[in-house]
Swiss-Prot record:
Region (Disordered) residue spans: 118-171
UniProt feature, compositional bias: Low complexity: 118-127, 139-164
CDD domains assigned: SSB_OBF
Record text on subunit structure and interactions: Homotetramer.
Alphabetized UniProt keyword annotations: DNA-binding, Plasmid
Domain SSB: 1-110
GO cellular component terms attached to this protein's record: nucleoid
Gene name of this polypeptide: ssb
A GO molecular-function descriptor: single-stranded DNA binding
Protein name: Single-stranded DNA-binding protein
GO biological process, one term: DNA replication
Compositionally biased tracts (Gly residues): 128-138
Lineage of the species this protein comes from: Bacteria, Bacillati, Actinomycetota, Actinomycetes, Micrococcales
UniProt keyword ATP-binding present: no
Length: 171
């Protein structure tokens, strides 16, 4: 939503993401991120851990399925989203309110790991927000050389000015 404050949290997943489906069929993945600030103590010449923040998070739809398939317990992640409060009642009738992170973007941190990213084929065009990469191509669209402005031009007669060392620039 426009105007809402987003935050970014870097931390480790405390368990594998839990994937569920709503009665209407929407996927949701829930997980907890543990983020511990570290500071360097010059007197003792060592790193000191601060108090760990445990933050519950949820991600929806296709991203939820991608998270459940890709991320596991202990994975260091970078998560961006919006804080939301949610109230509920326990089995004992006590009213509780929790603060959770509604995830907009999530990915593995490459600081201490590497990853090979595989782009998924989209089944339908219900992507809300920035899902799907450059240009939000829908319904399994494949980027062709014609659609890709950065692709090398294979035909020399396409009107480009870089046709050799003696060609004149268009200006």
């Amino acid at each position: 939503m426009a105007g809402e404050t987003t935050i970014t949290v870097i931390g480790n997943l405390t368990s594998d993401p839990e994937l569920r489906f709503t009665p209407s069929g929407s996927a949701v993945a829930n997980f907890t991120i543990a983020s511990t600030p570290r500071t360097f103590d010059r007197q003792s010449n060592e790193w000191k851990d601060g108090e760990t923040l445990f933050l519950r998070a949820s991600v929806w739809r296709e991203a939820a399925e991608n998270v459940a398939e890709s991320l596991t317990k202990g994975t260091r992640v970078i998560v961006s989203g919006r804080l939301k409060s949610r109230s509920y009642e326990t089995k004992e009738g006590e009213k509780r309110t929790v603060i959770e992170l509604e995830v907009d973007e999530i990915g593995p941190s490459l600081r201490y790991a590497n990853a090979k990213v595989n782009r998924t084929q989209r089944n339908n065009n219900q992507g809300a927000g920035n899902g799907g990469g450059f240009g939000n191509q829908g319904a399994g669209a494949q980027a062709t050389q014609q659609d890709d402005p950065w692709a090398a031009n294979s035909s020399a007669s396409a009107g480009s000015w870089g046709n050799g060392p003696d060609s004149e620039p268009p200006f």
